[in-house]
Amino acid sequence: MVNSANMKHSETDQVSLELGRRVAERLRWQPELVAFALANLARWSRQNIAAPSLLRCYAEWQIILSRPVDEICDLLCAATEDAQRLRQNSPFAGVLAPAEVWAVKSRFRHAPATA
């Protein structure tokens, strides 16, 4: 098994981007996943009521999720610092099967280093 804690920051960013792309691919065909993401945000907001930084992130995602699906998908696939920051707390957790997530992590963890 691949442990995310042992991954380099650049590997974590690559994994996050690939997972975002895979979620976006599903979201284009299953726009109802926006409701799933909103439910995650509602639950997380209740669970993390004493964490203002997380609540700000969740509020930002709520605004994003009110946009058209294509715009949400563009953000999930963007290689920008802002998109990377947002993907760190993606409300789409649970959309991808654990085996798929681990396969992506494993692929990047064991990929040859590029300079």
Predicted feature locations:
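Basic, alpha-helical nucleic-acid-binding regions used in initiation and control of genome expression
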Residues: 2-115
